[in-house]
């Protein structure tokens, strides 16, 4: 009887460990994808937004030469690019199921709509402004090896950098605070 109980406990422990790996650890492993090298383009309508949040190694270009969003990426990555407006911020990233991309190219060109007042880049992403961005109050945040390059005219601005990130900016403002 004791042997049966011990076997039942061991089976339950193995099932619990398997369930843990399937539910918790497996999503952390994600997909590993290598860019194909064949760049394709997709155009989507631009939603209303006043800020840009880039993450997961995507490059965002702010241009006054486009009115829609243009996504350029390797043909095997283009369907994994996520561009959406959430609470007024334009999120540009990759699908969460992708864990690692090798030799991948993802460039998202967004319109300089005259409303942009914040730039936030993280996780090796880049934001490049091709035109001067104007706002009353402007915020720039870069973290985790991200890069932001922009020209800003504002009454006030804040710039925050951390974790090997870089901000290269031309700022014209009455006041500007920097936290690096």
Where are these regions (language model features)?
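Intrinsically disordered, low-complexity terminal regions
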Residues: 1-180
């Amino acid at each position: 009887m004791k042997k049966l109980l011990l076997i039942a406990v061991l089976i339950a422990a193995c099932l619990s460990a398997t369930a843990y790996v399937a539910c918790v650890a497996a999503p952390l492993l994600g997909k590993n994808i290598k860019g194909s090298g064949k760049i394709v383009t997709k155009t989507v309508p631009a939603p209303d937004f006043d800020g840009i949040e880039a993450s997961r190694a995507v490059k965002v270009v702010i241009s006054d030469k486009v009115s829609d969003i243009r996504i350029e990426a390797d043909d095997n990555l283009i369907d994994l690019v996520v561009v959406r407006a959430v609470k007024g911020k334009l999120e540009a990233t990759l699908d969460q199921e992708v864990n690692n991309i090798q030799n991948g190219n993802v460039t998202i060109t967004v319109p300089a709509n005259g409303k942009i007042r914040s730039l936030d880049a993280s996780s090796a992403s880049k934001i490049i402004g091709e035109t001067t961005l104007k706002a009353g109050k402007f915020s720039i945040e870069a973290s985790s090896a991200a890069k932001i390059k922009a020209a800003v005219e504002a009454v006030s601005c804040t710039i925050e950098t951390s974790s090997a990130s870089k901000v290269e900016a031309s700022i014209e403002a009455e006041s500007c605070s920097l936290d690096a």
